[in-house]
């Protein structure tokens, strides 16, 4: 999964005991929009429902706010809405804890059920404030993504219905009996809806049972975390539902011992889920959305723990940062969002939301089409052309286009704060390519090397992202340069987006990768990155030069080109991992050079061989595509050198030259011509020779792994597995 909106955070401060080990922590770049949503729902609740402490002890924290860390890849334009929804849920939950009879469960649940079924919630003058808030929130979400907004309302209604059971007194016989009830009571269904809406995910209905099964450890870990930290807040409630209380009663122990039991269970469930994420991402029998959902949900686990350690909701007296204090005292009208949305697409059909959720009018803000002045429920005028990001939008015609009124055009020309165009267009070709199936071989190589190098998770993640961007960019450019119609059995990127957009997207990834390299902890990492990038371009230049001029290189020249081109990425990731390793002063990257060279050479020669001999490869890339491209593969070089050295094959040499010239003129070869070339290769036994070289290199790779295991004093099973996967 590509991470567009978040960065890795060192979680050692928040989890010194390592309870969430194996699960990273990420922070959303647009976290300020969460605060705006939270303070907006607080203002609406006080106006429409009743008194509320200020600031409210909900999702916000002085350093870590809930959604910013638990949904780090939420589409930015949806972040304020799900923040509003979450704190609405917290406020309603607090009412249930204090007095379930006065919490209006049937009214709220009925409103949400109607919203889930019809896409709207009926309201009138006599409607409760909670119903009005739910109705307005649903309208905002429907404007962004109708299908997922209705799914959210439906799942939230199920959670509210379950909360009604809290009035029942329960005599739990065991923790395992308590857990299923509490997991549902936790607000899991509401949270499921928020995440799928926020990240624009739809898990297929036929995978629902599998989704619940895979997610179970994460839900349990979050439930136990919630109960652990909320115990002090809830222990004096009328009807507390808390694991600490249950454990104390069942085990007949004190608070501290019960809390340790909670921590132990959290550690176990986190370890389970970390393994589930890893296994799920490697599966090929489930949808991409289910994979994405399971991967995203791991941040609910780590983010929930980090938030719980410092949030005012669980810690008294609560701490707030300065901006939160100002917004609590003066309102979000005076202190609006500081984050400027780059894009306003709804994630479904690329439709732009107009003002959407960011109106500053409180609960009755409008979409502001045509820039008309509207009145809210209290009769106060508001200008719908001002959104939550604090800038005026240009006047719009009824068709939603820029006004051509002279004053408006001049105002636009003088406006230095126009919204950014965003990177959505430049990323489209890249996102298409990365959505195609991939074996993730380079990620496997990084993880295998880390068995020895112990690189911190932040640097490891950055290197993986960097290598992915470079590899994807090179594939996009290679397909253009080689005129390849297929990539992984799908149309190549340039076939869909055109050469110009694909080149622009690919080069943008190079700039992104450079930025990532500059952010690595070792200052030498950027120099390593630039050195290897230069080698990649030089290697590619020879490949293109030989193809364009129909010049057959020697085996020596071919291998050197492979070292710089294909082997370059393996060498780069190896050198970067060594540079970022805590023991880099004791490890010379030269010690790993033979391995990276061998992998690069084996990988390329294997690719050459499969292009000519594998039916699956033909399905993925086209029949004997290297001959269409005019590439001088290892097998073709051997064939040419063999016929040139054998006078008995003079006629085959003439035919081979004729085919290569024809390919250059026509831009490809017919299947009949390709079959003739394969026939010549059969006579020279070039495929057999290539297979023999591959098997010899395989043995050398295995010996090199053994040598390195001796050097590092540790067996490396992931590396051996990776090498074994390459066998032909």
UniProtKB/Swiss-Prot annotation:
EC numbers for this chain: 4.2.3.145, 2.5.1.29, 2.5.1.81
Residue ranges annotated as motif DDXXD 2: 478-482
Gene3D superfamilies cross-referenced by the UniProt entry: Farnesyl Diphosphate Synthase (1.10.600.10)
PROSITE patterns: POLYPRENYL_SYNTHASE_2
Region annotation Disordered: where it falls in the sequence: 362-394
Binding-site positions, isopentenyl diphosphate: 439, 442, 471, 488
GO MF terms, alphabetically ordered: geranylfarnesyl diphosphate synthase activity; geranylgeranyl diphosphate synthase activity; lyase activity; metal ion binding
Motif NSE/DTE, residue numbers: 226-234
A biological process from GO: terpenoid biosynthetic process
Ligand binding (substrate): 93, 182-185, 226, 230-234, 313-314
Cross-referenced Pfam families: polyprenyl_synt, Terpene_syn_C_2
Region: (7Z)-ophiobola-7,19-dien-3-ol synthase, residue numbers: 1-322
Disulfide bonding pattern of the chain: none
Binding site for Mg(2+) 2: 93, 97
Motif DDXXD 1 positions after renumbering to this chain: 93-97
Family annotation (SUPFAM superfamilies): Terpenoid synthases
UniProt keyword Metal-binding present: yes
Region of interest called Geranylfarnesyl diphosphate synthase, as start-end residue ranges on this chain: 323-728
Bound cofactor: record note: Binds 4 Mg(2+) ions per subunit.
Residues annotated to bind Mg(2+) 3: 478, 482
Pathway: Secondary metabolite biosynthesis; terpenoid biosynthesis
Record remark on domains: The conserved DDXXD motifs as well as the NSE/DTE motif are important for the catalytic activity, presumably through binding to Mg(2+).
Family indicated by similarity: In the N-terminal section; belongs to the terpene synthase family. In the C-terminal section; belongs to the FPP/GGPP synthase family.
Primary role: Bifunctional sesterterpene synthase; part of the gene cluster that mediates the biosynthesis of the sesterterpenes ophiobolins, fungal phytotoxins with potential anti-cancer activities. The first step of the pathway is performed by the sesterterpene synthase oblA that possesses both prenyl transferase and terpene cyclase activity, converting isopentenyl diphosphate and dimethylallyl diphosphate into geranylfarnesyl diphosphate (GFPP) and further converting GFPP into ophiobolin F, respectively. Other sesterterpenoids (C(25) terpenoids) are found as minor products of oblA.
Protein name: Ophiobolin F synthase oblA
Organism of derivation: Emericella variicolor
Gene for this chain: oblA
């Amino acid at each position: 999964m590509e991470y567009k909106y978040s960065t890795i955070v060192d979680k050692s401060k928040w989890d010194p005991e390592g309870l969430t080990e194996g699960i990273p922590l990420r922070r959303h770049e647009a976290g300020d929009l969460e605060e705006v949503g939270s303070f907006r729902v607080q203002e609406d609740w006080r106006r429409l429902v009743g008194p509320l402490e200020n600031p409210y002890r909900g999702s916000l924290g002085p350093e870590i706010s809930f959604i910013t860390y638990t949904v780090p890849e939420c589409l930015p334009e949806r972040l304020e809405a799900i923040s509003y929804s979450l704190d609405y849920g917290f406020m309603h939950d607090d009412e249930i804890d204090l007095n379930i009879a006065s919490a209006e469960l049937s009214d709220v649940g009925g409103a949400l059920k109607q919203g889930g079924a019809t896409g709207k919630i009926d309201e009138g003058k006599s409607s409760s404030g909670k119903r009005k808030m739910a109705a307005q929130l649903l309208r905002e979400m429907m404007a962004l993504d109708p299908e997922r907004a209705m799914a959210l309302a439906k799942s939230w209604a199920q959670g509210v219905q379950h909360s009604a059971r809290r009035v029942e007194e329960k005599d739990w016989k065991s923790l395992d009996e308590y857990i299923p009830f509490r997991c549902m009571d936790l607000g899991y269904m509401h949270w499921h809806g928020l995440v799928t809406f926020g990240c624009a995910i739809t898990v297929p209905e036929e995978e629902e049972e599998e989704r619940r099964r895979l997610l179970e450890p994460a839900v349990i870990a979050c439930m136990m975390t919630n109960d652990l930290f909320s115990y002090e807040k809830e222990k004096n409630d009328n009807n507390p539902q808390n694991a600490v209380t249950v454990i104390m009663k069942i085990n007949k122990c004190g608070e501290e011992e019960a809390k340790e039991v909670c921590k132990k269970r959290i550690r176990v469930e986190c370890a389970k889920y970390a393994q589930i994420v890893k296994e799920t991402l490697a599966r090929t029998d489930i949808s991409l959305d289910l994979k994405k959902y399971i991967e995203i949900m791991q941040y609910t686990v780590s983010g929930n723990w980090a938030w719980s350690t410092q949030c005012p909701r669980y810690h008294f007296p609560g701490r707030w940062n300065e901006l939160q204090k100002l917004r609590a005292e003066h309102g979000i009208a005076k202190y609006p969002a500081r984050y400027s949305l780059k894009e306003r697409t709804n994630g479904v059909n690329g439709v732009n939301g107009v003002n959407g959720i960011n109106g500053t009018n409180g609960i009755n803000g409008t979409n502001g089409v045509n820039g008309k002045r509207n009145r809210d429920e209290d009769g106060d005028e508001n200008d719908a052309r001002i959104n939550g990001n604090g800038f005026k939008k240009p006047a719009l015609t009824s068709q939603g286009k820029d006004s051509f009124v002279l004053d408006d055009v001049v105002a636009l020309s003088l406006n230095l704060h126009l919204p950014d165009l965003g990177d959505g267009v430049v990323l489209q070709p890249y996102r298409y390519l990365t959505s195609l199936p991939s074996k993730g071989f380079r990620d496997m190589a990084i993880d295998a090397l880390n068995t020895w190098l112990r690189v911190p998770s932040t640097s490891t993640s950055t290197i993986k992202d960097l290598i992915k961007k470079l590899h994807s960019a090179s594939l996009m450019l290679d397909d253009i340069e080689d005129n390849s119609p297929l990539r992984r059995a799908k149309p190549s990127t340039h076939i869909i987006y055109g050469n110009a957009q694909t080149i622009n997207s690919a080069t943008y990834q190079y700039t992104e990768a450079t930025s990532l390299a500059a952010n690595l902890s070792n200052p030498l990492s950027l120099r390593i990155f630039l050195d290897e990038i230069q080698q990649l371009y030089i290697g590619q230049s020879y490949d293109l030069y030989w193809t364009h001029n129909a010049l057959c290189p020697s085996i020596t020249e071919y291998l050197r080109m492979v070292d710089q081109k294909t082997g370059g990425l393996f060498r780069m990731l190896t050198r970067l991992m060594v540079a970022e390793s805590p023991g880099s002063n004791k490890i010379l990257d030269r010690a790993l050079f033979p391995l990276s060279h061998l992998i690069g050479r084996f990988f390329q020669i294997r690719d050459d061989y499969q292009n000519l001999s594998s039916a699956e490869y033909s399905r993925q890339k086209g029949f004997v595509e290297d001959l269409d491209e005019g590439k001088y593969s290892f097998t073709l070089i051997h064939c040419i050198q063999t016929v040139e050295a054998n006078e008995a094959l003079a006629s085959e040499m003439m035919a081979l030259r004729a085919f290569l010239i024809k390919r250059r003129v026509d831009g490809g070869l017919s299947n009949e011509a390709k079959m003739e070339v394969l026939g010549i290769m059969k006579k020279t036994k070039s495929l057999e020779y290539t297979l023999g070289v591959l098997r010899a290199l395989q043995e050398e790779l295995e010996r090199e792994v053994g040598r390195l295991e001796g050097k590092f004093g540790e067996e490396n099973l992931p590396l051996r597995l990776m090498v074994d996967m390459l066998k032909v």
